[in-house]
Each structure stands twice: as C-alpha cells, then as structure tokens.
C-alpha cells in the first residue's frame, strides 16, 4: 500500500517537516519551495485493514523545535488492499481556540457519543472528507450536503450523515467515481431525534477541483473545522470535598461510593460538574493534623478513609458486623468529621476483611493486572506506609533502616513469604479497592453526563514517598508558599519542598507527565492548584515561619549598583531586622519590658536593638513557644516574628551580592523609618521588581513546562490563578487555552473592588467562594461596610444592607453568577444551599472549610444533611434546576 502525505507549512532555512508516530523514528517530508511538503511511504497492511495514528513536527539539526497540537491525534483507517493508494492532504494543527471541546470532559461526558456510527463504507476510488465538529451532542450529528445527487443536490433533508467513529472528528467516504467536478458542499447540523436538518454551517461553500484520482486511489481531505451559529456551551457545577459528603450509610466521612449519590443529585439539578479536593493519602501520624488534603505522602495513592467499606465486602463475624454497624451510626451522627475515630475504625475493618478476603483478592486477575500497571509507585508507597508506622514517624531520615531509598532492598521486602509481606500487601489490597471504587464513580458520572473534576496540589510533603524515592527532583532546603494576599497578610508557608525544575527538564518532565496521566484515569477535568508555581514559586528559607522573608524562584535579583540606580543608597543594615525603641510598645503593649529583657539586646544609645542569640530566627522563636497557646504567648510570639521579618531587603539564596526587596514591607516599621526620598526610590524599584521585571522571564519559564504537561492528557485544564499575578500569566493561560478562576470578591482588575461578572473571559470558571474562603453567607457578615458597598454598588439596591445574607439575596447573587460570561459556574455546596431558608445550614460558622492563615486548620466540614435528604428536597432542587436552565447553562444541543 502507498501512502502519500501532503502538507503546507512555511519553514525557515534549515527546518524540515517530519511525520512521527508511524515508525519508531520520524519520517522526513520533502519540498522544493519550503512551503509544500510531501512524502510517499510504502506500508504493509493486514487484510482486515488497520488504523494509523500520526502527527507532524518541525525539526532543525535533528532537534524537534515545534510539534503540532496532538492531544487528539490524526487517525485514518486503511483498507486491506495491497494495491491501494492513499493521497492524504493535511493542514498543520495549532491548538484550537475551542480546545475545551476536545477535552475528555466533553468527549467522554458532557457531549459524549456513547453509540458511535460504524466506519464509513470504502470504495475503490474514494474521497474521504474529515472534519472537526466537537460542539455536537449525542442527539445530533454532522451531515454533508452539496451540488451532487449523492450529496442531496443542496436539499438539507437529503443530506448524507457522517460517521462519528472518531468523535469529535467526523468522516465520510464518497464514491469518487460517481462525483462530478468541481465539487461544492457544506456541512449541516442534523437532528437525529427529529430526523431533520437543524442549521447550515457559517462558512461559504467548500470547493474541490477534480483531484484526478486513479483506480484504487483514495483522496483524504483532513483538518476541516466546522462552526455553527449556536450559543456557546455553558454549564454549572458543585464544589465539595469528598470527605464532606454524607449519606445515610457513610462511615462518618464521605467516601467514593457517596460520589455516585452526588452524581444523582447533580443530574437532578441540571449540574454538569462535581469538583473535589485532592483525595491522596495524607497519613503521617494518624492524628487529626493529617486532615490537610494538600499534604499528601503520595501523589498516586488514595486516602484509605475514602474507601466505601460496603463495596469492599462483608465480614463473616456477626459480632464484628454488629460492632461496626453501631460505630457507623455513632460516627455518622456527628456534625463534623472525627478524623481520628473514623480512620481508626476503618483500619480495624480493613485488617479484619483483609484476613478474611485478602488472599483471594490478591490472587485474582483483576488485582494482578492492577499491580503490574501500578507497581512502580504502589510498592514504594506500601513499604513507606509500613515503615512509617513501624518506626512511628513519616520522617524517613530518622528511620534506623531504609532511610535512604534502595530499590533492590524494597523489592526484597515486597516478596511474598517474607515477614514484611502481610503488612505491605495490606496496602496493595486497600489501594486496589480504592482504584475500583473511584473508577466506578467516574464511569457512573460519565454515563450520566457529569464531569468529575480533580485537584492537583502544587507541592509534595517533604516526608513523602516521592521525597524518599526521588529526592533529586526537589529542593529540600527551602519551603514553598505564597506571598501576602487576601488570604493571609503574612503570606503562606506550606512547608513543601520546591521543585528542581532544571533536573525535571532533563528527562522531559517525566515525573509530572506520569502524575497527570495517572490522574486522567479517574478525572476528566482538573484544577491546577497555584498555577503560578509553574511560572515561579515563592520560596521561604527553612529558618522562617511566615512567608514574608521569601523570594521568587527562579528570579532576577538586584545588585547593589542597580538598587542605587533608583536613588536609594544600599546599606547592609537593610538586611538585618530593624528593631527600635519607638515602636516596641505598639507591638507588645504590656509585654514590652519582658520582651526587651528576655529576647532583645541593645545595640547603642540610639534605641536600636537586635535579637539575642538563640532567638534570631522565627524557627528558634517557634521552638520556644511550642505548646504555649495562651493569648499572651501568641501575642509575644507573633510580635517576635514581626521583628525578625522587619527587613528592607532579603539576600538572594543563590548569588552573593544580589538582593530582593522584601515583599509587602511598606506596611512595616523599617519602611516607615525611611525619609520621603528613600521611600519614593524604594517604591520605584519595588514596583519595577515585582510587577514588570520578570514578565518575559517567567513567561519563558512557564512555556518550558506547561505546554507538554497540559497536553499530556485530554483532561480539561483549569488554573487557580489567584493572588499576586504577574502580567504574563494571562498570556500563557490564553495561549494554552487554560481556564482561569474568577471570584467576584477577588477581582483581577485592581481598579475594581468587586469583579464585573459580564467581563469575565469565556474560558474561565466562575465561583462565589473557594474552600480557602468564607462562604457567601459568612463573607456577608465579616465586614459590614464592604457588604454595604456591594449591596448598593454591585447589586444595585438602595438603602441599608441586611445584616445577614437572606435566601432572596443569596439567590440573586447565585443567579448573577450563573448569568456570567464564564463557560463554567461552579459553586460550593454551601453557596448553592444558601438560596433556600429551609435547607441551608442554620449555623453559618460551621460551613467554613479552611482558614489559610491557620497552619493547623482541622479539615472536618460535613454536609449538615444527608444526600438522601438532599434528593428529596424538591423545592430546593427545582429552584436550582430552574436557575440553571433559565440562565442558559443546560444546553440541549
């Protein structure tokens, strides 16, 4: 069989177009003018035919410098005739503007075509027309109509239906021997239910001159894009952590089985997306502090508490069954999660069931297939978990044995028959059940047209499987966090190590690629937590507790000479804490004398002090105050932290003699100590440094990583782009078609106090609040003056704002958000229920999930009613469904 590939691409000198995917090595095309490229290949095809997949790329001196968009690869079915010739006319594929429609969120759930048409009939002399039309749901199909009898003679009712076997690409093969040229045609949106044409495409007639085909030759015309004049697709969804779900059979915490019940409610209320928080294992000490879902010990393993024990099996011991039944009722009746009791009880169940069923399950074909596919991460995770409990610490550096990961030693421990194996294989068993359960929930959601949206944390724990097995990928001498923002005036210190991007780049970001690809098994959309981390990360020194002493990595620090070019004379004192008698009373009040006596020492007679040895870093101060949480101790501790961070510049961690202006220092005493000329000079360099200097640099950093990572799967990509946002972020997200996050009370336009919903970009996710924020009702009561301005200026109401957010007000705000321009409006469970006085939680304070400024937040929020009650809440469900329908977020085509 002969394949003739043809593509138009304007190259520069030294560049060549090549085909990849057909053979282990890419195949060069040839050109005479640097524009039109061709290649002719001979291929053996089995008699039953075969499908080939391929893509184009540009190489220079043997190096790939550009690839076309290949998330949805080119696919052609070849018949089995050895004498057949295929002439394939392609166009270069850039990332589509409507990339979201090609994501698995749409092709597998929202606009899925579960019953695909057969591969089109084949002809000796054929004309294959292929076109991309992703915005078509299962009740419609693409049809073709033209100036031929075989194409209906422009009668839309006689249009020929195309095959969706490779949806969202459509195709048809025409008998070229019966066609008259020139051929003219257009595409039609056809209603399969009503068996009639719905509308014509918006383009002019498409035209094809006589291709002069030979016998046994088929011409393939590919890469046509079809657009119809129909409304842009919009949908609504719910955001709720899995742990917060509550059914009548839950075991004190939401589980993967409960996800199916949430899907039922989403369908009942016309919602299309369920967004959850990370579900990875976070077990460090088995205490409630492990409840933080972003501090996982594995980027692959799921948290055992999410196992639905009903699906795992039934214990034969009747007494044990009775005991667990009683415990289930007790834990499930609690208004909030008792993390320790829930996990302890579930682990008792796991151990009993494993003794009863483990051997049989581990011998099953299903488990063996799962193990072979996942052993690369499953074995280290299981051993890590076993050793963590055996040595009573997740800090592997303190383990007496295996503190340094050796793959050979771990492999020996995992061999059946060893003393360690029963303890290790228990984790295999649990992870296998979790895999089956989440996969089942995912498939259930897809079947019902609902998307499960996951969450990828930006960081990993420094006491995790990955830090143990792959330490070369991380900078373990720093802490990731975030600069000061609306969430925390002192910045956030997450404690995670930062990534060694230079090492990751060398193997093509394999670590990240595997992570994304694993996630794609269970999710069709995901949120990149803190997407800014792919541009730069806020890195905090290990000696700091707060985030104020951090610096961006990578970054372009300033030299003394550059600092002084702004008019500020650089002094070494700017690197040291500025501590002066004049403001100590403001910081410490009645504790001032104690602080001066115990923690400070005088420098000279001018009133200057320095920290005493032993208290020069925030970590040293933290150590002193461990366990002292009374009001006075907290006051003194936080004041000492403030003194230590009261510096004007921070030294660069890599380059000696280079510096960073300290973030947010204008609020601190050291800045106030400058004269007006110095303040103005500092503000000029500060503005240049934080808002202009790095734009192009960080753009390039992001474009090294994000294109191949976001295109490594077909999941819909959403970025959490909140906080201190460089100007380059929106450019990158737009170039890569990543959905942004829009929150009205955190507007991206600094001129606005509240975001303008009608100005949100279409490629965005709109929400009222996130898990890191107070709910709508909670926010309404936080700052009455701000609420009043929102009530008058944004909602357009006259008079005095109510002191609480009434159901009517909440419904108005929800409706406004549903009417926004965003493709997705995903609201928290709490904000959805706020619109109904009967069903919303009477206690607003119980609805808060996380307070970012509190590093010891207990993540224990639960629904205040069960999913069964929710399904029966007809007035609420009807109201939500009607709101979604009448705001255009339940499209029928």
Walk through the language-model features, giving the residues of each.
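Aromatic-rich carbohydrate-binding modules that target alpha-glucans
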Residues: 2-51, 59-80, 133-181, 190-213, ...
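Catalytic cores of glycan-processing enzymes that make or break glycosidic bonds
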Residues: 98-124, 128, 175-178, 209-893
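C2-type phospholipid-binding modules
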Residues: 79-88
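An acidic-aromatic pocket/loop used at catalytic or ligand-binding sites
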Residues: 5, 93, 99
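Intrinsically disordered, low-complexity regions enriched in Ser/Pro/Gly/Gln/His and often acidic
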Residues: 29-30, 62, 85, 161-163, ...
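Intrinsic disorder/low-complexity segments in short proteins, especially the signal peptide
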Residues: 8, 90-93, 224
């Amino acid at each position: 069989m002969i394949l003739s590939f043809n593509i138009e691409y304007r190259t520069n000198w030294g560049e060549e177009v090549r085909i990849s995917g057909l053979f282990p090595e890419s195949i060069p095309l040839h050109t005479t003018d640097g524009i039109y490229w061709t290649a002719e290949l001979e291929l053996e095809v089995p008699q039953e035919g075969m499908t080939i997949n391929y893509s184009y790329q540009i190489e220079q001196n043997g190096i790939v410098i550009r690839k076309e968009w290949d998330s949805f690869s080119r696919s052609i079915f070849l018949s089995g005739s050895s004498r057949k010739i295929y002439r394939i006319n392609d166009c270069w594929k850039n990332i589509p503007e409507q990339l979201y429609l090609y994501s698995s969120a749409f092709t597998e759930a929202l606009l899925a075509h579960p019953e695909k048409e057969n591969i089109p009939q084949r002809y000796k002399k054929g004309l294959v027309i292929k076109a991309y039309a992703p915005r078509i749901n299962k009740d419609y199909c693409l049809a073709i109509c033209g100036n031929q009898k075989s194409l209906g003679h422009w009668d839309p009712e006689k249009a020929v239906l195309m095959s969706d076997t490779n949806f969202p690409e459509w195709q048809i093969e025409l008998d070229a021997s019966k066609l008259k040229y020139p051929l003219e045609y257009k595409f039609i949106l056809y209603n399969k239910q009503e068996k009639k044409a719905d509308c014509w495409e918006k383009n002019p007639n498409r035209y094809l001159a006589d291709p002069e085909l030979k016998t046994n030759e088929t011409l393939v015309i590919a890469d046509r894009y079809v657009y119809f004049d129909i409304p842009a697709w919009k949908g609504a969804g719910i955001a709720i952590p899995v742990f917060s779900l509550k059914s009548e059979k839950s075991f004190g915490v939401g589980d993967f089985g409960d996800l199916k019940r949430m899907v039922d409610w989403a369908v009942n209320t016309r919602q299309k997306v369920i967004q959850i928080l990370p579900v990875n294992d976070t077990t460090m000490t088995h205490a409630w502090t492990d409840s933080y879902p972003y501090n996982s010990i594995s980027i692959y393993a799921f948290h055992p508490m999410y196992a639905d024990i009903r699906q795992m099996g039934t214990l034969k011991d009747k007494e044990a069954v009775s005991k667990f039944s009683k415990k289930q009722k007790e834990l499930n009746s609690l208004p909030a999660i008792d993390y320790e009791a829930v996990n302890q009880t579930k682990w008792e169940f796991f151990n009993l069931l494993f003794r009863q069923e483990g051997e049989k399950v581990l011998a099953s074909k299903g488990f063996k297939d799962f193990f072979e596919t996942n052993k690369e991460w499953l074995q280290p995770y299981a051993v890590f978990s076993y050793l963590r409990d055996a040595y009573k610490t997740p800090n592997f550096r303190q383990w007496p044995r295996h503190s340094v990961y050796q793959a050979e030693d771990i492999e020996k421990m995992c061999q059946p028959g060893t003393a360690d194996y029963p303890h290790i294989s228990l984790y295999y068993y649990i992870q296998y059940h979790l895999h089956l359960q989440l996969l089942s929930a995912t498939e259930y959601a897809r079947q019902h047209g609902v998307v499960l949206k996951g969450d990828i944390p930006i960081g990993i724990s420094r006491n995790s499987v990955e830090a143990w097995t792959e330490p070369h990928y991380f900078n373990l001498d720093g802490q990731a966090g975030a600069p000061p923002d609306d969430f925390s005036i002192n910045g956030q210190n997450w404690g995670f190590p930062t990534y060694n991007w230079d090492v990751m780049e060398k193997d093509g970001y394999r670590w990240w690629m595997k992570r994304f690809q694993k996630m794609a098994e269970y999710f069709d959309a995901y949120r990149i937590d803190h997407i800014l981390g792919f541009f730069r990360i806020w890195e905090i020194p290990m000696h700091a507790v707060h985030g104020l002493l951090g610096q961006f990595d990578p970054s372009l620090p300033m030299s003394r000479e550059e600092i002084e070019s702004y008019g500020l004379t650089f002094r070494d004192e700017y690197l040291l804490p500025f501590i002066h008698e004049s403001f100590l009373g403001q910081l410490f009040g009645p504790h001032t004398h104690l602080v001066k006596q115990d923690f400070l020492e005088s420098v000279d007679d001018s009133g200057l002090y320095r920290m005493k040895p032993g208290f020069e870093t925030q970590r040293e101060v933290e150590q002193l105050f461990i366990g002292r949480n009374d009001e006075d101790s907290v006051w003194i501790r936080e004041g000492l932290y403030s003194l230590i961070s009261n510096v004007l510049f921070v030294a660069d961690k890599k380059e000696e003699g280079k510096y960073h202006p300290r973030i947010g220092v204008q609020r601190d005493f050291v800045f106030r100590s400058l004269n007006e000329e110095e303040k103005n000079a500092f503000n000029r360099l500060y503005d240049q440094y934080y808002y202009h200097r790095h734009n192009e640099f960080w753009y390039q950093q992001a474009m090294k990583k994000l294109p191949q990572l976001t295109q490594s799967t077909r999941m819909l990509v959403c970025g959490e782009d909140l906080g201190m946002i460089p100007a380059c972020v929106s450019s990158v997200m737009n170039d890569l078609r990543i959905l942004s996050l829009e929150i009205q009370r955190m507007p991206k336009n600094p001129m606005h106090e509240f975001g303008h919903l009608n100005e949100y970009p279409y490629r965005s996710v709109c929400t009222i609040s996130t898990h890191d924020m107070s709910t709508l009702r909670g926010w309404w009561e936080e700052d009455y003056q701000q609420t009043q301005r929102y009530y008058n200026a944004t909602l357009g109401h006259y008079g005095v704002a109510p002191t609480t957010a009434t159901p009517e007000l909440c419904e108005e705000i929800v409706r406004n958000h549903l009417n926004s321009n965003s493709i997705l409006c995903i609201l928290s469970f709490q904000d959805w229920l706020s619109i109904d006085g009967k069903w919303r939680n009477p206690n607003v304070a119980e609805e808060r999930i996380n307070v970012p400024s509190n590093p010891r937040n207990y993540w224990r929020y639960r629904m205040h009613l069960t999913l069964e009650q929710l399904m029966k809440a007809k007035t609420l469900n009807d109201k939500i469904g009607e709101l979604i329908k009448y705001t255009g977020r339940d499209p029928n085509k």
